[in-house]
Structures are given as structure tokens and as C-alpha cells.
């Protein structure tokens, strides 16, 4: 699959696993890239809301949240499922967030932020959002605030570009390692993604 057409989820996962097997720590790099993306577009002191889901996409958002908090941003974290079942790398990211003095809540804040980081679901999502997640996505969309999606907007099937329910509408999508093919072809997934950006994290796709 040519880069212009995007890569399959399997191709991206295989490249990720090769890098991890070589001892590469990718989550700190992804989180730093997301934080840098926000910092380049919003002044210090801006209110950032990081939506952290139950997987490693949520871990990327937590790393970004910790870095932005340390840089002087007002950062809020919403974790609808809490930290209890996070995978190991994301659990370390959560510990880093707490060590930075951060706290989290399960619900959205009452006041809309200046910008939202979407770390709810990444390229692994292949089923419709359940009612709880869909309600959250709809509420964020209703704010009409700029959203940075990490890897893929939550609610989009990264392989097909289908929207699984109603997707979070991003102004920007920052893909890591490679852009998923569901974001590169015309369709609802591409429309939800907004402006596409890529950080390879130094990982080569075969």
C-alpha cells in the first residue's frame, strides 16, 4: 500500500510491534508530538481537555496532558472508564500524569475548553460506539471547539473509513507511524479527520 493511499491497520501494528521489540518507547514520543502540536497553535495558559480512553490511545493523550500541564497550560483530563484497566504503557502514562500533579474525572467538564485532545479510541476500533461513548462524542461535537484526534477520530474505522455511529469531528488528526488508509480515501472517515498530519516517530513501514 503506497503512503499516499494510507496503510492498513495490520501494517501499522506490525511496524509498531517491530519497534517495540527493539526496545523503542513509542508512547512518550507520540504524547510529546501531540503536546508540541497543541503548543504550536495555542498560547500557554489555554485550557486543554484530554479525553483518555481505555487503551494506548488514551496513554498518548495522558502523556500529552502531563507535558502541557508542565508547560503552563490549564489541563483537564476526562477518563470515562478510569485508570483501573489500562494496559501497561498507558498505566505508566497515567502515573506520569498524576506525578505531574494532574487529576481526572469521569465526566466532561461543564465549561468547554479551548481545545480538545481526542485519545478515546485509536486505529483498533472496529465496532460501533456504545451509548455511553456516543453520548460523550456527541457532547464534545456540540461544543464546536477545535479537536486534535490522535491516530484517528474516535468513531472511525481506520481501515475502511466508515463511521461507526457518529464520529468525533476533528479539526486536525495527527497520525503516528503511518496514516491509516481509512483517512486517506474520500468518505466519512476522511471528512471527520479534518487536516491530516503525520509523525512517524522514527518508525519505518516496510
Curated annotation (Swiss-Prot):
Keywords: Isomerase, Metal-binding, NAD, NADP, Nucleotide-binding, Potassium
The protein's Enzyme Commission number: 5.1.99.6
Record protein name field: NAD(P)H-hydrate epimerase
Protein role: Catalyzes the epimerization of the S- and R-forms of NAD(P)HX, a damaged form of NAD(P)H that is a result of enzymatic or heat-dependent hydration. This is a prerequisite for the S-specific NAD(P)H-hydrate dehydratase to allow the repair of both epimers of NAD(P)HX.
Entry superkingdom: Bacteria
The protein's required cofactors: K(+)
Enzyme class label: isomerase
Record's cofactor remark: Binds 1 potassium ion per subunit.
Residues reported to bind K(+): 57, 118, 154
Family note: Belongs to the NnrE/AIBP family.
Residue intervals of the YjeF N-terminal domain: 12-206
UniProt catalytic activity: (6R)-NADHX = (6S)-NADHX; (6R)-NADPHX = (6S)-NADPHX
Single GO MF annotation: NAD(P)HX epimerase activity
NCBIfam families (alphabetical): yjeF_nterm
InterPro entries: YjeF_N_dom (IPR004443), YjeF_N_dom_sf (IPR036652)
Residues that, per the record, bind (6S)-NADPHX: 56-60, 122-128, 151
Amino acid at each position: 500500500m503506497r503512503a499516499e493511499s494510507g496503510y492498513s491497520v495490520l501494517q501499522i501494528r506490525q511496524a509498531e510491534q517491530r519497534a517495540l521489540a527493539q526496545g523503542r518507547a513509542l508512547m512518550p514520543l507520540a504524547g510529546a508530538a501531540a503536546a508540541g502540536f497543541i503548543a504550536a497553535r495555542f498560547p500557554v495558559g489555554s485550557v486543554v481537555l484530554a479525553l483518555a480512553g481505555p487503551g494506548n490511545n488514551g496513554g498518548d493523550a495522558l502523556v500529552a496532558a502531563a507535558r502541557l500541564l508542565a508547560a503552563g497550560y490549564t489541563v483537564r483530563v476526562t477518563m470515562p472508564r478510569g485508570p483501573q484497566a489500562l494496559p501497561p504503557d498507558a498505566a505508566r502514562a497515567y502515573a506520569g500524569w498524576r506525578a505531574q500533579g494532574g487529576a481526572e474525572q469521569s465526566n466532561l467538564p461543564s465549561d468547554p475548553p479551548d481545545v480538545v485532545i481526542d485519545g478515546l479510541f485509536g486505529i483498533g476500533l472496529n465496532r460501533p460506539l456504545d451509548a455511553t461513548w456516543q453520548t460523550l462524542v456527541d457532547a464534545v461535537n456540540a461544543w464546536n471547539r477545535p479537536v486534535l484526534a490522535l491516530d484517528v477520530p474516535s468513531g472511525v474505522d481506520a481501515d475502511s473509513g466508515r463511521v461507526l455511529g457518529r464520529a468525533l469531528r476533528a479539526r486536525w488528526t495527527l497520525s503516528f507511524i503511518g496514516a491509516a488508509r481509512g483517512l486517506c480515501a474520500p468518505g466519512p472517515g476522511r471528512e471527520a479527520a479534518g487536516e491530516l498530519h503525520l509523525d512517524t516517530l522514527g518508525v519505518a513501514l516496510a
